[in-house]
């Protein structure tokens, strides 16, 4: 039996995954906040793929080291990250009202891109809760050191999130798939009153790019080229197919697992 864990508390991602028919639990990752890493030098696609891996690995590593599971129980951890980019420049969540205005002004009357990166980590029962991990396992030792550092030095950069996952992947003991999708969104021209009205709502302030395509901003969407759900936070069609590929790959894991 395979259980799914979404490494996000996003209501929009929860809704999309639920509509695909999967039963899952949520375990939000705090890895991005822990890392305090500057991703500004990365292209949009590179950033979402790297962050999706970090989020999934953060939850997966905790699961591997702490979760006691029933025999035959496996997990797929799903991490995701979404950014809006205009002229290849990433627009984060607006910091305040003026930042939201700047973003909407930059997006209105033109097209922009939305990227979502997703990482799937398949964890068989044999590597959960220390099962299959020897005490002298160098990846386990490394992770324990990092975990102690995290407890002792809150706020320090944790650049090694994913080390345990990378090690297990190299040994063919788990499966990791990272991918991304791009959707082109065209926005109608907006006048000052429309912009002012929109940023006066609460909608822009927890959204990448300062807008919610499924909310009031839908009135200003001219057309979409690509997957609509990708803009909301998860590329539903691609995600479903990638999960199917994960199951195909499970037969290639080491026989000792």
Task: List the predicted regions and their residue ranges.
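A short beta-strand signature
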Residues: 113-123
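GST superfamily/GST-like fold recognition
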Residues: 2, 6-19, 110, 146, ...
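Internal, charge-rich low-complexity segments
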Residues: 122-156
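Active-site-adjacent loop/tail segments of enzyme domains
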Residues: 47, 82-112, 187-189
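N-terminal polybasic phosphate/anion-binding patch
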Residues: 1-76, 87-90, 128, 145, ...
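Short beta-strand-to-turn element immediately C-terminal to the catalytic PLP-Schiff-base lysine
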Residues: 85, 121-123, 221-223
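Residue-level signal for inorganic ion chemistry
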Residues: 17, 52, 81, 100, ...
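Short beta-strand segments
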Residues: 78-79, 117-119, 214
């Amino acid at each position: 039996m395979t259980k799914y864990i979404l490494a996000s508390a996003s209501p929009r991602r929860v809704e999309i995954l639920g509509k695909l028919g999967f039963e899952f639990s949520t375990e939000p990752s705090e890895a991005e906040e822990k890392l305090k890493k500057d991703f500004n030098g990365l292209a949009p696609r590179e950033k979402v793929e790297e962050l999706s891996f970090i989020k999934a690995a953060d939850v997966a590593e905790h699961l591997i080291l702490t979760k006691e599971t029933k025999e035959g129980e496996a997990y797929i951890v799903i991490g995701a990250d979404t950014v809006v980019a205009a002229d290849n420049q990433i627009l984060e969540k607006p910091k305040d009202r003026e930042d939201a205005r700047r973003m909407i002004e930059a997006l209105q009357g033109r097209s922009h891109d939305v990227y979502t990166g997703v990482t799937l980590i398949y964890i068989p029962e044999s590597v959960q809760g220390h099962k299959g991990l020897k005490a002298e396992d160098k990846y386990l030792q490394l992770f324990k050191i990092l975990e102690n550092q995290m407890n002792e030095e809150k706020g320090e950069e944790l650049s090694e999130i994913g080390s345990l996952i990378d090690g297990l992947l190299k040994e063919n003991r788990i499966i990791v798939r990272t991918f991304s999708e791009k959707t082109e969104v065209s926005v109608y021209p907006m006048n000052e009153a429309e912009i002012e009205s929109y940023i006066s709502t609460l909608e822009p302030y927890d959204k990448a790019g300062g807008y919610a395509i499924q909310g009031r901003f839908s009135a200003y969407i001219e057309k979409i080229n690509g997957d609509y759900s990708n803009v909301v936070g998860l590329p539903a069609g691609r995600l479903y197919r990638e999960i199917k590929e994960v199951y195909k790959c499970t037969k290639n894991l080491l026989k000792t697992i």
